[in-house]
């Protein structure tokens, strides 16, 4: 058989292909030749053929038939064969294929090889694609190489240990003795990988930071040497000594200094040194400064150091690089809760970012601008945000309008300003506002008795000839119907009165009724307004009767029903019409956002920043709730009854029975979800059904200590308790989930199960995202009925996405305080 062509010749041949079909033909022809060579067990050219196969794999063509040949090359004694074999294994194999387990013995032999380069190949492969089974079998060899004096092997072994810990976290303690001397190494590669290993251990186990805090002085010394060292061509990047190692050390210091006064004190000086001495003309220096800022803000640093960190972020906002401006805005958004006054100093720069062409920067600047709004700057900030609302892209208008509504409601200096601001939003972006904007504005106007004449006149002017903003038209129609007499009489004192006749008012409402832009809801507002004017106007009652009778035959069922009922009011109940259509009374405000939260910042009290994101609409991700019944093995379990219908019906049977086996399920199936417009009338009685729309308790049994139910991998779940003196069998547990890691935890779902003697109701969570750096929490309420006063116990299930991986964990909570159930 002729010798196969070399890899270089194959690459040159493939590059000459003019079409994709011609390239496929060349690849198929070469693959056929490689298969023939594999069948003949040709050891001479196996290495060359596998190398060509890997190139084809990189081009996107199938190369799975070369997997076993890679294993044969790994078993070879030639280094060149091993190198290609291990490379092929890393590209063609993964832990989902059983073939990779055949490599375990070869990797073990190579880890004990006398040549460091062979050992390095084995470490690289294990650290790249080793499964949990392989990691368990080979962790001992990795630990031995971690203690060797060879720096080439130590750095590779440290990275391999990181992979082992990720796959098998319970093997973490095996590597603890080997980590003691890692930071004494002079080699930067070993130092870098050692810091990566220590960081991974601290992130995986909540007990590790306390164990490694004794290394803080050593880490500080290493970082100081890097800053003070002279020019080193081996490690210099743009005039900075080994910035990669500096960034890694800063991240580890951030973890070790979190919630620890002594460690934070030990690193304050070096952080100040890094922040003041790092060159910012190059992107490398900006990366180090960014990590320094994150570390300063996350540990218990001095107030002066925090001001320095925020000033660095302020300088970042002036940088020409859009990426740097974006991370500065994101970081300021995280720190504004704790250092509100310091961030306020950079308000003008932040507002300027609203004019940036980059949409990501604009969105972050908008969110941060709303977070900076308070009672002192509300007028100036609203002026800028209204200008932004007028000129921004459509995808920003909904969030911006919602933020303006919340800010105006919270900090409005006067009712007139409040009404003018909301009307300006409705005029500018009426089609993008939330559904509750119309009733909220109507409620505000109703409660502002002294502003009725002013408001109806402004609204009348606003909709003259323009019905494009339907929410604005709806509010205007409602106000004209309620206060049309004030409009006609010209009683407005705030601005010059206008001369409007009754017929002109009816003309504009009839125009709304016949406009092609008017929705069915808007027409309903207009028809009701016309009907209400029959008790406020004196000269146009006959015209109103005629308009109402015309719509008695409308093809719109809702409009027709209204018109027929109004006609009946004229004909049969005319004596009651004035009483039925009298002016609406002052409405009581129903607060849905909870009380204003006050935070302490630098000795001054500031309102907590506004959340610009609307509350989550639609069903929460609770489809996995059925799996939770698997938690209490061997016990009868009461399934959780959700308080709101989910997107798909679930029951206590079906897939649950697959999970539970012989566990007896006694809970009734959950009812199928009802349509949103139809209330659920029949629902099985359940504990605390009558409390869902009322405050939970008026008399709370105080003095129940809170507990930490779960703390692992940066996620912490705390339980606080409330009990009613009038119904002591009911315990209300409020869970708070916080996240101390560097990335948000998304799609978070908390589930719980209790034994059959209890009843449990799990209310909807406040969000599905647990913010990073402990910048926010998810709250969720659990109601437990314990009529027999038995000791409370619970199993919980947590599912969420973190760092691109789906996480799931089960835990049992048995440490409930006696006051919560006795």
UniProtKB/Swiss-Prot annotation:
Residues 702-817 form the GAE domain. It is a peripheral membrane protein. The keyword Membrane applies. Keywords: Coated pit, Cytoplasm, Cytoplasmic vesicle, Golgi apparatus, Membrane, Protein transport, Transport. InterPro entries: Adaptor_Complx_Large_Subunit, AP1_complex_gsu, ARM-like, ARM-type_fold, Clathrin/coatomer_adapt-like_N, Clathrin_a/b/g-adaptin_app_Ig, Clathrin_app_Ig-like_sf, GAE_dom. The keyword Protein transport applies. Residues 597-628 are annotated as: Disordered. It is found in: Golgi apparatus; Cytoplasmic vesicle, Clathrin-coated vesicle membrane; Cytoplasm; Cytoplasm, Perinuclear region. One of its GO terms (cellular component) is AP-1 adaptor complex. GO terms for biological process: intracellular protein transport; vesicle-mediated transport. Pfam families: Adaptin_N, Alpha_adaptinC2. Belongs to the adaptor complexes large subunit family. Adaptor protein complex 1 (AP-1) is a heterotetramer composed of two large adaptins (gamma-type subunit AP1G1 and beta-type subunit AP1B1), a medium adaptin (mu-type subunit AP1M1 or AP1M2) and a small adaptin (sigma-type subunit AP1S1 or AP1S2 or AP1S3). Interacts (via GAE domain) with RABEP1. Interacts with EPS15. Interacts with SYNRG/gamma-synergin. Interacts (via GAE domain) with AP1AR (via coiled-coil domain). Interacts with CLN3 (via dileucine motif); this interaction facilitates lysosomal targeting. Subunit of clathrin-associated adaptor protein complex 1 that plays a role in protein sorting in the late-Golgi/trans-Golgi network (TGN) and/or endosomes. The AP complexes mediate both the recruitment of clathrin to membranes and the recognition of sorting signals within the cytosolic tails of transmembrane cargo molecules. This is AP-1 complex subunit gamma-1. The lineage of its organism: Eukaryota, Metazoa, Chordata, Craniata, Vertebrata.
